[in-house]
Amino acid sequence: MRRQEALAGTASEAGREGEQPRPAGLGCRTRAEPGGPQESRQQWKTFLYCEPHKRIKEVLEEELSIKRDECHVKSPPTVALDGIWSIRRNLPVGGTISGQQSRNSSLPQAKYYSRHGGLRR
């Protein structure tokens, strides 16, 4: 008897709002309890997809293409930096310098590069 009164109470509340009666405790995308009065009915929430306006789609595509162009570099970084700085050209490390032959020329010489003083031995 209490269950029927509860259903009648929810039905009268739903009638005031203009909605269909829904059992207490049921949300969207749920089924009614088995054996209940609404067992055969399913209450699913449906969603409708609407495409954006043509002009909005065009603007979004333009922005996307601009971002793609910004991400792609026209020339690879190795080619761009090749003419600016080269280890072989700027740091003669490892090879013997012509004109400076010492008696230990066959032994490897330790050379260090310092940004404050250039090459050091």
Swiss-Prot record:
Disulfide bonds: none annotated. Disruption phenotype: Mice exhibited no impaired function of motile cilia or non-motile cilia. Induction: Expression is activated by FOXJ1 and NOTO. It comes from the Eukaryota. Residues 1-41, 94-121 are annotated as: Disordered. Residues 98-108 have a biased composition (Polar residues). Its main location: cytoplasm. Keywords: Cell projection, Cytoplasm, Cytoskeleton. One of its GO terms (cellular component) is ciliary basal body. It is found in: Cytoplasm, Cytoskeleton, Cilium basal body. Predominantly expressed in tissues containing motile cilia. Also expressed in non-motile ciliated adult olfactory bulbs. PANTHER family: CHROMOSOME 11 OPEN READING FRAME 97. This is Uncharacterized protein C11orf97 homolog.
